[in-house]
A protein has these predicted regions:
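Active-site helix/loop module of the DD-peptidase/beta-lactamase fold
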Residues: 46-63
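Short secondary-structure boundary segments
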Residues: 9, 47-48, 74
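Structured binding elements
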Residues: 40
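Glycine/small-residue-rich phosphate/adenosyl-binding loop
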Residues: 1-25
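C-terminal helix-cap and adjacent tail motif
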Residues: 68-102
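Hydrophobic pocket-lining residues that define ligand/cofactor binding sites across diverse proteins
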Residues: 33-36
Length: 102
């Protein structure tokens, strides 16, 4: 059965809220997604664009903000977890990564 997690923080635009709260939020989301994958559970982040609607549905306080949601679920086909990466569509790494100079 799929599940979702709402990542709610103090409003990052409010006075006194450190910008690091967004970094911390990203780190927490990343950790949840990595642990889920280790357990064979897939995940997808979704940005919340309509704060008013999210607040109404989830009931979090006015002085808080829900930047995004994480959805979790088992893949429909377990073989997808072990299939090797397929080539196609990706640029070679040496076109994207530069060392010392561009």
């Amino acid at each position: 059965m799929p599940a979702a997690v709402a990542l709610v923080t103090p409003d990052p635009s409010a006075t006194g809220v450190p910008l690091s709260v967004m970094f911390d939020l990203g780190m927490a989301a990343d950790s949840m997604m990595l642990v889920a994958w280790e357990l064979g559970i897939g995940s997808v982040p979704a940005t919340v664009y309509r704060q008013g609607l999210a607040r109404e549905l989830l009931g979090y306080p006015e002085d808080h903000h829900c930047e995004f949601l994480l959805s979790f679920g088992y893949p429909a086909d377990p073989a997808e977890l072990t299939r090797p990466l397929q080539s196609g569509g990706r640029r070679p790494l040496d076109e994207l990564v530069h060392e010392d100079r561009w």
